[in-house]
């Protein structure tokens, strides 16, 4: 199966030349690299969040495989949907799904379902791929889309991903795709976002999940991020750093 791009021309340029130029401009090449277990990046249109995502990717030592955890904005498909075979297409070419790792994740989970419907119209993972393609290194990936936001579902996903990565003994990096506060003032966004960011920097998935709900933080990918933190802790993560932060008002 080949999944065709659905937000090309809106979230990012629709022609290979323009997309390659913009994506390369967003990836700052001279930053010191780190070998990370996971990263959290935004997924708005490149004009709004591309520089934040690009700054994060520029800091990372490139792995062989990315596990992409994104929210399901459409509500269509399984509560937690994975695709284990095929390729995803962008104007810069096709990116293969890592079938071996995807099937290992599915095998280790009680919650994740094989389902392409949840991914068909969803942009949160798609927008990451051109930025990674612009880095010029071959890679494969595993797409996991979460609509279920209960902590138990996040825990199941996180532990399944961690077990599969540990079993693979390969170079794998997890990415949680999430924007921060929506539909509030810049001042309100910064206050609320800080609460979520502090939980992420503390590598505390329970705290993140709790504070987002209690404080009414409209962080659309808090559940993929919670799952990532659970997996990262299981894989030995003990610290995190903030690479960059901005709101759409800063553009």
Residue ranges with predicted function:
Residues 1-230, 234-237, 245-250:
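Active-site histidine-anchored catalytic micro-motif
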């Amino acid at each position: 199966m080949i999944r065709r791009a659905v937000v090309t021309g809106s979230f990012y340029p629709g022609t290979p030349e323009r997309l390659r130029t913009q994506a390369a401009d967003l990836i700052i090449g001279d930053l010191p690299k780190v070998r990370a277990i996971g990263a959290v990046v935004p997924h708005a249109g490149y004009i709004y969040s591309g520089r934040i995502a690009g700054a994060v990717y520029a800091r990372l030592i490139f792995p062989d495989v990315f596990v992409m955890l994104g929210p399901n904005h459409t509500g269509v498909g399984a509560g937690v949907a994975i695709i284990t075979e095929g390729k995803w297409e962008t104007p810069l070419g096709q990116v293969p799904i890592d079938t071996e790792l995807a099937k290992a994740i599915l095998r280790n989970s009680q919650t994740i379902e094989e389902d392409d419907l949840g991914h068909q119209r969803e942009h949160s993972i798609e927008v990451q791929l051109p930025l990674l393609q612009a880095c010029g290194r071959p890679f494969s990936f595993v797409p996991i889309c979460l609509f279920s936001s209960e902590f138990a579902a996040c825990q199941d996903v996180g532990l399944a991903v961690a077990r599969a990565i540990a079993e693979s003994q390969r170079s794998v990096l997890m990415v949680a795709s999430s924007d921060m506060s929506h539909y509030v003032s810049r001042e309100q966004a910064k206050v609320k976002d800080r609460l979520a960011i502090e939980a992420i920097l503390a590598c505390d998935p329970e705290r993140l999940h709790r504070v987002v709900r209690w404080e009414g933080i409209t962080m659309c990918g808090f559940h993929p991020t919670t799952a990532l933190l659970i997996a990262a802790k299981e894989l030995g993560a003990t610290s995190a750093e903030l690479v960059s932060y901005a709101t759409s008002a800063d553009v």
